[in-house]
Amino acid sequence: MNRKVILNKKQIENIIKRLSFEILERNLSINEICLIGLEKNGYTIAKRIEKFISENSTKKIFTIQLKYTNRNFKLSKEIEKKQKNVILIDDVLKSGKTIIYAIKFLLDYNMKKLRTLVLIDRSHNEFPVGLDFTGMKLSTTLEEHITVNLGKEESAYLN
């Protein structure tokens, strides 16, 4: 398999740190933020952002996992009524289909704000998804695939 590393562990750490600072800067007057990570990598990114923000501010921050299979979504725990500032997080945005269905699901909750964050935006949107926070924008062909590994050998690669 021919694969090209596009982000190494240090680069991923730096992007997550920068995204965390952006979240803090854009939410100066907000005391509580709810991070909702799409299962697996989106949730892992959300937990890392939560850790960074907790260590660097006094904001209350909560992380919830959003599990999904075939357009069926389920939160790992309910969003409390007072948690109205939500950031939906995923690792890679390709067509926007997963995020648009997740947004549709989350609109049933009473939120003041819903923002989106991705580690890598592939620029192949087929759905009208606006991103509020983007780690990296990378134009690829439709045949190429980006894989993000946030495990032991952390990297993002193109194949």
Which residues does each PLM region occupy?
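PRPP-dependent phosphoribosyltransferase catalytic core
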Residues: 26, 104-159
